[in-house]
Regions:
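N-terminal lobe/hinge region of extracytoplasmic solute-binding protein
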Residues: 49-100, 131
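Extracellular/periplasmic solute-recognition and catalytic clefts
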Residues: 149-151, 204-213, 244-301, 311-312, ...
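A structural "hinge/loop" feature
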Residues: 52-68, 91-93, 119, 168-178, ...
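Alpha-helical secondary-structure segments
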Residues: 47, 122-129, 155-157, 199-200, ...
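Surface-exposed binding/hinge segments that line
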Residues: 41, 108, 142-183, 191-207
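Aromatic- and charge-enriched surface segment that lines or borders ligand/interaction sites
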Residues: 94-139, 153, 159, 255, ...
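Aromatic-rich, solvent-exposed beta-strand/loop patch
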Residues: 116, 161-178, 196-248, 272-291
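N-terminal export leaders
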Residues: 14-18
């Protein structure tokens, strides 16, 4: 299984959250996990207790963390983030060559990346995927307003031309929710019925309200750089991943303590002391940052339509008060 943040929620947050897993390999740098020695070495399968049944397995259409947490094992983007939130290449060979006017991005793909269907990834797959993302993804639609064209240049080249300079382009392509996933062009449909990506796991089966089953992709084309955040080398240490919906947080806690789950997502912080006293069955990891706190003002009507008042509120309520 990918060791680089495989099961973490996608965004670091500003409040403490708890998770628990049975393996160091499952631990990621977001929220609280409890990991134990059982999964620290390669093994055949793992059961992962998630907060709900995913509404869809289409990571473009949904911005839900749950969907991305599962399907980031199946699909990969052109770019992603390292541990310091710098944009780094994933399916792209390197960062793009940007024209002097900031309008043209020339992207070269890694050679020999295998799709789950058994053939190599080509530029046509990337173009078709990005066009679908622009049409279907909430994030992609916003980016699409800035894009003049997306074209393949040979087997491994992709050119994105913008209408005007757009600084967030690479970050938007790297975001792991509503993500710009790259898929085999022949699998593209709405809704998706075939999940053909390049990730370290391939989709095997979904039984609604029971599980989503992923199996290791033995021909996975990993990057050579060391794992770093979402970037770098990803390794599938476990043969099968079974994601099960367990909406009740207390059930996730008890299941983790009983050894029923190898990983349990988003547990109440109040469970920390029990997990710490589990006799080595679980190893909790607490991250005090989880989520993005922000204020939203109604600028159309009411007292906060006044910009000076909004600035006063912003000054009075600094980041410390929001945390």
């Amino acid at each position: 299984m990918p060791v680089n943040r495989s099961f973490s929620p996608f965004f670091p947050a500003r409040r403490a959250v708890l998770q628990v897993a049975a393996a160091t390999a499952l631990a990621a740098a977001c929220s609280l996990l409890a990991t134990g020695p059982a999964l620290a070495q390669a093994r055949h399968h793992a059961t992962l207790a998630m907060v709900a049944e995913p509404q869809t397995l289409d990571p473009m259409v949904s911005t839900a963390d749950l969907v991305g947490t599962i399907m980031q094992h199946v699909y990969e983007p052109l770019y992603t983030f390292d541990a310091k939130w710098n944009v780094v290449p994933m399916l792209a060979e390197g960062l793009p060559k940007v024209s002097a006017d900031g309008l043209s991005y020339a992207i070269t793909l890694r050679r020999g990346v295998m799709l789950h269907s058994g053939r190599e990834l080509h530029a046509d797959d990337v173009v078709a995927s990005l066009q679908r993302w622009i049409e279907m993804s909430p994030r992609g639609k916003a980016v699409g307003k800035e894009v003049a064209s997306i074209q393949a240049k040979g087997a491994l080249g992709v050119d994105i031309v913008l209408k005007a300079p757009y600084a967030p382009l690479l970050s938007q392509l790297a975001l792991p929710s509503g993500m710009a996933t790259i898929m085999a062009k022949e699998s593209i449909a709405l809704p998706l019925t075939s999940f053909v990506g390049t990730g370290p796991y391939r989709f095997k089966e979904r039984k609604p309200d029971q599980y989503v089953l992923l199996t290791r992709f033995d021909k996975y084309s990993a990057r050579k750089e060391p794992a770093n955040g979402y970037g770098g080398k990803r390794e599938a240490l476990i043969e099968e991943l079974r994601f099960v919906p367990v909406p009740n947080a207390n059930t996730r806690v008890e299941g983790a303590l009983a050894g029923q789950y190898d990983y349990a997502d988003l547990l109440p912080v109040e469970a920390l002391s029990r997990l710490e006293k589990s006799g080595g069955k679980t190893v909790p990891i607490l991250t005090p940052s989880f989520g993005f706190p922000y204020l939203v003002f109604n600028t159309k009507e009411g007292v906060l339509a006044n910009q000076a008042l909004r600035q006063a509120v912003q000054t009075a309520m600094g980041p410390g008060e929001m945390l």
